[in-house]
Amino acid sequence: MAAKEVRFHTDAREKMLRGVDILANAVKVTLGPKGRNVVLDKSFGAPRITKDGVTVAKEVELEDKFENMGAQMVREVASKTSDIAGDGTTTATVLAQAIVKEGAKAVASGMNPMDLKRGIDKAVDAIVEELKTNARRVTKNDEIAQVGTISANGDIEIGRFLAEAVEKVGNEGVITVEEAKTAVTELEVVEGMQFDRGYLSPYFVTNPDKMRVELEEPYLLIHEKKLSNLQALLPVLESVVQSGKPLLIIAEDVEGEALATPVVNKLRGGLKIAAVKAPGFGDRRKAMLEDIAILTGGTAISEDLGIKLENVTLNMLGRAKKVVVEKENTTIVDGAGSKSEIQGRVAQIRAQIEETTSDYDREKLQERLAKLAGGVAVIRVGGSTEVEVKERKDRVDDAMHATRAAVEEGVLPGGGVALLRAVKALDSIRTENADQKHGIEIVRRALEAPVRQIAENAGAEGSIIVGKLREKTEFGFGWNAQTNEFGDLYDQGVIDPVKVVRTALQDAASVAGLLITTEAMVAEKPKKDAPLPPMPGGGMDF
């Protein structure tokens, strides 16, 4: 086992604080509409330019093990805030640095770290309640656009695209962000349910120009297993032919004569038909087929239910207004399933999302929920160069999460003003313990940090801006760094989601509390490289 180095008390905290400062100073330059860029070196390809706090934080790795521990703790603040709220990572980092700095000074002067932490926790709880009390619900589309614009560092186009996406797919819908192949940013909305499986044979194509199958008011045969035997399929095919409607077969696979016969039928013009593979794998495939069945009002044909293919009747098949099958995607528009059954299925998936502990499972369940309840919107981010596209995509990701959070819990005045105004909630906290009182004061001072940093990044003097804001008492009155004007931030469209502000403060205080109460640090001693062997002398034979 390698030897360890141990640091105690002030020595440990100083090292840790240096690491916190290095990471926080690199991250906080990105805060606000006039935030600066950070260039990240990549071992391959061009350097990456970003204004995204968590992306910068993830790149910082320090040589000194003790300093690195401090930096990694603050990186955890940024990552956790990003995971929960999707934005506010830079604000969380700035708050954590401010609380840790003041807290370390207090501990060095002989105060009790545990009481300081209790005071900080009390203050944070009071501030969070104050923020929730002053929240405004988001109802209008232009308010969603404002949140997106602020989060995307003042990019109005991104805000507009996000508002349009939320309007079309709802808050349950999935919004995905991809890199475009062109310089133009565009939004594509997929109505209905789409899954990533295309036609099994190009002979099914009905629209040769676009190379896709378009079926109007088709029946859907949803089968869990492989289809290879034509005899079992014949009764269903005959019933569908008599009805005069098209047919879409969704099965694990369709092969042999079960595929050849529909192809021949289609070519002879007897029956409009298409076959696709079922989406997903294993248990997830079963669940997705059940989703399709509920959406279209059909039955998922499964041997588990004791239903044989030869006994299937027309009323067991699903119905939809339209189905479009492309080379790699199938879209079912306006399924004929009953509203109550779809809502029941949605509630069931929501319950599974609450219960699951796996991030991967949660993501897949969210996708299924969106396909049933909302729709799918794809924002394709364009730019002149790869570096620009990546930087813009980072901002679109942030803005997307911020708009979701705004619809969930409402909004507050932006620009760090909400935290500054919420300070009055600290006046009502009663405690006899002097160290706890100091913990509350630490939070009071730290809440100014975001406003100061936004001002400094915009080239203004932080203390003057804070002083002017203190002169007015209205909750929405603040400073717009983009236009360098004072006024009502709600009217100017400078707003932040409650969830983002709240999460940033809670995560910052949580990690700062741990750092303040740290008394010892243990790290592996750096290994000294063994000396190289002496060079062989001249004329020596080997």
From Swiss-Prot:
Species annotation: Sinorhizobium fredii (strain NBRC 101917 / NGR234)
Family membership: Belongs to the chaperonin (HSP60) family.
Physiological role: Together with its co-chaperonin GroES, plays an essential role in assisting protein folding. The GroEL-GroES system forms a nano-cage that allows encapsulation of the non-native substrate proteins and provides a physical environment optimized to promote and accelerate protein folding.
Reactions performed catalytically: ATP + H2O + a folded polypeptide = ADP + phosphate + an unfolded polypeptide
PANTHER family associated with the record: 60 KDA HEAT SHOCK PROTEIN, MITOCHONDRIAL
Location in the cell: Cytoplasm
Binding site for ATP: 30-33, 51, 87-91, 415, 496
InterPro entries associated with the record: Chaperonin_Cpn60_CS, Cpn60/GroEL, Cpn60/GroEL/TCP-1, GroEL-like_apical_dom_sf, GROEL-like_equatorial_sf, TCP-1-like_intermed_sf
First-tier enzyme category under EC: isomerase
Keywords: ATP-binding, Chaperone, Cytoplasm, Isomerase, Nucleotide-binding, Plasmid
Superkingdom of the organism of origin: Bacteria
Subunit architecture: Forms a cylinder of 14 subunits composed of two heptameric rings stacked back-to-back. Interacts with the co-chaperonin GroES.
Enzyme Commission designation: 5.6.1.7
GO CC annotation terms, alphabetical: cytoplasm
GO MF annotation: an example: ATP binding
GO term, biological process aspect, one: protein refolding
HAMAP family: CH60
Protein name listed in UniProt: Chaperonin GroEL 1
Pfam families from the UniProt entry: Cpn60_TCP1
